């Protein structure tokens, strides 16, 4: 949340908020998607997208400049071939966008941060890119009724003004990659080796 608030405040500078929490549960009805949407106060809900499409890089970049929170709902639906594009989008801090029927590009700051949900535990396909995702197992139904947006965002703003760190250190990134191993999808070769030699 600190990374999101820093991104919205324009504090991220040359480094964007490149980490996305992914809420994971094999059980339906845990309120994962509802929680993601509930993070946005009602006055900002129009800046929330819950169906990020990775079919057009230009469209995705426009969303980075115009939205506040992009939910990669059902994260496992994204093909492995789209992961390089997603990782690139997540690290972008400035965007060069050309609107339809215009000849010149405009440089716009990135505003949006990412979040995601999944019903599968084997959702990460690139072990080198797992530091971009903070996979969190949801073990029970999330109570979305008690979110006090004014308090949350006031606290985030205060922490940022006091200089709170909103990025991971190299050591924390290493711990994150280790944590995410339980959410890693095995390749076909790994599956065959595991089946033959366990």
What are these regions (language model features)?
Residues 1-65:
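P-loop NTPase catalytic core of nucleic-acid-dependent motor ATPases
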Residues 16-19, 46-47, 57-82, 88-90, ...:
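Feature primarily recognizes SF3-like P-loop helicase cores of small DNA viruses
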Residues 36, 86-87:
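Short amphipathic alpha-helical segments and helix-helix/interface helices
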Residues 41, 82-83:
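Hydrophobic alpha-helical membrane-insertion segments
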């Amino acid at each position: 949340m600190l990374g999101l608030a820093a991104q919205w405040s324009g504090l991220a500078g040359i480094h964007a908020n490149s980490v996305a929490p992914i809420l994971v549960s094999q059980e339906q009805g845990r309120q994962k998607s509802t929680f993601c949407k509930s993070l946005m106060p009602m006055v900002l809900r129009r800046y929330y997208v819950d169906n990020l499409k990775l079919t057009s890089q230009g469209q995705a970049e426009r969303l980075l400049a115009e939205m506040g929170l992009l939910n990669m709902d059902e994260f496992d639906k994204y093909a492995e071939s789209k992961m390089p594009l997603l990782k690139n989008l997540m690290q972008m801090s400035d965007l060069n966008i050309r609107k339809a029927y215009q000849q010149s590009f405009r440089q716009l700051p990135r505003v949006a941060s990412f979040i995601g949900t999944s019903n599968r535990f084997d959702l990460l396909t690139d072990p080198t890119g797992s530091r971009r995702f903070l996979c969190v197992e949801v073990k029970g139904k999330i109570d979305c009724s008690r979110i006090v947006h004014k308090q949350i965002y006031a606290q985030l703003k205060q922490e940022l003004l006091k200089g709170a760190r909103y990025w991971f250190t190299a050591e924390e990134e290493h711990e994150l990659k280790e944590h995410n191993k339980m959410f890693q999808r095995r390749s076909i070769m790994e599956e065959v080796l595991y089946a033959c030699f366990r």
